[in-house]
Every structure is written in C-alpha cells, then in structure tokens.
Amino acid sequence: MAKMIFVNLPVGDLVRSTAFYQAVGGEKNPQFSDDTASCMVFSDTIHVMLMTHDKYRQFTSKKIADAKNTSQVLLSLSVDSRGAVDETVDKAQAAGGAPDPSPVDEYDFMYGRSFEDPDGHLWGVMWLDMAAAQSATAQAS
C-alpha cells in the first residue's frame, strides 16, 4: 500500500474553505466530512482535512496560528504541465485566494507558482520535467 498524507488545516469558515479547495481540484469525500470537517481528496495518496477551529483543537493543545500573519509550512502539489500550474493558481484566485505570495520559480526543467488560501495557508504548485532536471544536474557536476 502506498503511503498517504493527510494535511490537517484549521479554517475559519468551513463552507468557504470547502468551496475554495473544490475550485482548485479537491473532491470532497462525504464519508469523512461533516459539519466540523471536510475531507478534500486530491489523489489516492493526498488528502486535505479542513477543520473548524473547535474540531482542530481536539487534536492539539497548542494555540492555532493565524496563517495570514504567521507561516509555519509551505505545502506544494505537483501537476502534469506548466499550463496546469497557471490554471491552478488562476482557479485559486477566482475562488478568493491570493496569487503568487512567493516568487515564481522558472527554469527550463521546472515551473512553480504559489497561492494563499482564504485562511492564509500557503500552497505551491509545481511542474517538473524529471528528465530535463536530471540532465541539468548531471551537466552541473
């Protein structure tokens, strides 16, 4: 069985956040969603659990960070093409996110942009041509 990742994010408005993550490609799994959490599926191995602050507090005694003012993690998803990078960031902006809070990464073998969700969580979207990346690495050494 492939290893899976479940990213748990506290959100201020579950309905708004669920709609946002659906707009950028997540599919809500009703089996693991209720009025306190939405399980957003991005692939067989990548899930984002959106939780109300009350629900999130059940898992930690630590204070919930204000992601609009504090950054602890930058999450990144890979996509299949350069165009899909731009498309995903455009969808994030149309759904209420902020495009490109981080500099755009552009190389012959890689292209990456970022967005901030309505709660301030930072996401990177990247495309990588693995063969070209390996070639560039080999030439550099």
Where are these regions (language model features)?
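N-terminal beta-strand motif that seeds the catalytic metal site of vicinal oxygen chelate
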Residues: 1-19, 30, 72-77, 126-141
